[in-house]
Amino acid sequence: MRVLWVLGLCCVLLTFGFVRADDEVDVDGTVEEDLGKSREGSRTDDEVVQREEEAIQLDGLNASQIRELREKSEKFAFQAEVNRMMKLIINSLYKNKEIFLRELISNASDALDKIRLISLTDENALAGNEELTVKIKCDKEKNLLHVTDTGVGMTREELVKNLGTIAKSGTSEFLNKMTEAQEDGQSTSELIGQFGVGFYSAFLVADKVIVTSKHNNDTQHIWESDSNEFSVIADPRGNTLGRGTTITLVLKEEASDYLELDTIKNLVRKYSQFINFPIYVWSSKTETVEEPLEEDEAAKEEKEESDDEAAVEEEEEEKKPKTKKVEKTVWDWELMNDIKPIWQRPSKEVEEDEYKAFYKSFSKESDDPMAYIHFTAEGEVTFKSILFVPTSAPRGLFDEYGSKKSDYIKLYVRRVFITDDFHDMMPKYLNFVKGVVDSDDLPLNVSRETLQQHKLLKVIRKKLVRKTLDMIKKIADEKYNDTFWKEFGTNIKLGVIEDHSNRTRLAKLLRFQSSHHSTDITSLDQYVERMKEKQDKIYFMAGSSRKEAESSPFVERLLKKGYEVIYLTEPVDEYCIQALPEFDGKRFQNVAKEGVKFDESEKTKESREATEKEFEPLLNWMKDKALKDKIEKAVVSQRLTESPCALVASQYGWSGNMERIMKAQAYQTGKDISTNYYASQKKTFEINPRHPLIRDMLRRIKEDEDDKTVMDLAVVLFETATLRSGYLLPDTKAYGDRIERMLRLSLNIDPEAQVEEEPEEEPEDTSEDAEDSEQDEGEEMDAGTEEEEEETEKESTEKDEL
């Protein structure tokens, strides 16, 4: 023990001597060296650049190598649209900067989806790196944030194309939508993901962005930008990634919060917990570990044990090394998301909030879904699916309807994402439904085109449609009428037209305005429940607005008798009803066409027949003489009460509303045979025998069939009925002339009286004529002055003589 004590004392003395020596060196130091410790404020521009380069050096590259890279790299200017878009993103989303991480992770997930899909047909695709992950690392010392994925990566050309240019049409649409959203006060943060420009949100928090990427078909390259321009150069380190992309952000001073581990973890959980690949964050944690004791501590412990224990002679055992418990900070990759897909879990185990969070994550929407359904289908094909109805219709829902990708269903095969670009996963009219489908029964190692033709896809589609209609049917009536129908009512009507197999189910989802209520909409089920006892048809009237429909002469008698009439006010409505022959055993009757009949007693029937006989001369005169080439026939009307007459289409002809719609078609050229056929069909002219105009016409034609005034009146009544019945007049000038003639007669003005001619305007004088006239006027004035002077002298002479 005494020897150990002496050795310890010697060590202390030696240490003290070294400290004194260091102190002497510090004292002898120069003033410049002391000042150099605090020269940050007086550094030159070159030193600032050097310090910056040192701060953002990449792994394996020092400051001089970074400088050399920048000098040799090829510089590019951003496309004009990209500059505009970046400015708009930065200015509009500066209050919601955190979405940058969501967009970078989303892009990483897309890259991983692509390489996994490629690997199904190319066994060497994953040779560079077997794992499929996203890793995030914060570097506080260097002010850097790294996001790395092992996805498909980018070639040099793709770096230039994907990160430096954008399709002009897409950019223009994005800018327009951003502007509209800002004007409407709506959130703009979701738009950047929907339009594929999320990468540029990195400049919300970064002064510089460095992208290192390795594609299987190219060497590793580095892309760098400060948002003003960008450069690309081959990575001198070679292939360090194996495959994939690392995005390095040099964070702005005010964005330093995004280097905090808790902040990054919370953002990943908030936005990306349902990404289908593991997301890791480089994290620290405190662990308690066993460490071997040092020799002095071990000897001391052994001595204490030998003093306390009694000497017992036992067989010697092998001595175990002595250890102690120590707390250490350990850094490792921490998994942040539950990578088991939510649709693979039983629906009973998934909370409503999880469905909402998953919907927002994969659809890039900010609102909760209106409805959702989670189910497992079994039978000919087994698959799991979650379907959602969004709260509002996606933008451009009917732009190029059916001709482009329009559905939002992501197809997975054995948890491997295949595509979201199938046109046939959902019918066109359900293009607003979003969701995922995952099946184990579909083949993996085939092309997308081959898979699209697979017979099982038709079975999947059929079940998806049925489940979707079940989901929509379960939406509460109030929510359905107030929200769903306003957003997606047109889709349901198109479904009735297009989907023959589900027409009956879709008909139950239809809603229309009706005469039953001034504002509320009604279903066909509700209409049938309110039908009169002997009513066998569902009556409807089509028009450009409710006001036009309910003021039409065709509904006068129906409303007076208490029949409910459905009002069709949208262009697609009449097509929809025409495609639906009946509902619940009741056929539809367009009240603007032939076939409207009422239940009548024997007495009423006799009275009607007597009226028809009384007006037979007028009806024949109209058909054979006054309106000979304009109508098919003239009859006494059963549907008119206030109007004098109406123009009724045949059962298979066009109503006024349909004719207006067909003639307004953008592709209408006037050469379509069927269109011309329907448009040229003559109509039935119905008269109201109780109207004073009609009764007076009957009296007049009995007196004189060739009365020109009555002939004019008949034509004016026909043309007025044409307009009131919803049709267009082929010759509006002739109609106007006839109205003028009728007004002249009513005011006792001679029909042949001509319009008074305007007085002729005096011709304008030329400059020479003006000068001549001024000269003549001057001479006349001079002559007049002389005559006045002579008369004045004469008068004065006469006064003198007197």
UniProtKB/Swiss-Prot annotation:
A motif (Prevents secretion from ER) lies at residues 799-802. The modification N6-(2-hydroxyisobutyryl)lysine is found at residue 168. It catalyses: ATP + H2O = ADP + phosphate + H(+). Residues 1-21 form the signal peptide. Changing residue 103 to A: Loss of CNPY3-binding. Phosphorylated by CK2. It holds the Pfam family HATPase_c_3. InterPro entries: HATPase_C_sf, Heat_shock_protein_90_CS, HSP90_C, Hsp90_fam, Hsp90_N, Ribosomal_Su5_D2-typ_SF. Glycans are attached at residues 62, 107, 217, 445, 481, 502. Keywords: Acetylation, ATP-binding, Calcium, Chaperone, Disulfide bond, Endoplasmic reticulum, Glycoprotein, Hydrolase, Hydroxylation, Nucleotide-binding, Phosphoprotein, Sarcoplasmic reticulum, Signal. The modification N6-acetyllysine is found at residue 479. The modification Phosphoserine is found at residues 64, 172, 306, 403, 447. One of its GO terms (molecular function) is RNA binding. NCBIfam families: PRK05218.1. ATP-dependent chaperone involved in the processing of proteins in the endoplasmic reticulum, regulating their transport. Together with MESD, acts as a modulator of the Wnt pathway by promoting the folding of LRP6, a coreceptor of the canonical Wnt pathway. When associated with CNPY3, required for proper folding of Toll-like receptors. Promotes folding and trafficking of TLR4 to the cell surface. HAMAP family: HSP90. Homodimer; disulfide-linked. Component of an EIF2 complex at least composed of CELF1/CUGBP1, CALR, CALR3, EIF2S1, EIF2S2, HSP90B1 and HSPA5. Part of a large chaperone multiprotein complex comprising DNAJB11, HSP90B1, HSPA5, HYOU, PDIA2, PDIA4, PDIA6, PPIB, SDF2L1, UGGT1 and very small amounts of ERP29, but not, or at very low levels, CALR nor CANX. Hyperglycosylated form interacts with OS9; promoting its degradation by the endoplasmic reticulum associated degradation (ERAD). Interacts with AIMP1; regulates its retention in the endoplasmic reticulum. This is Endoplasmin. The lineage of its organism: Eukaryota, Metazoa, Chordata, Craniata, Vertebrata. The gene is Hsp90b1.
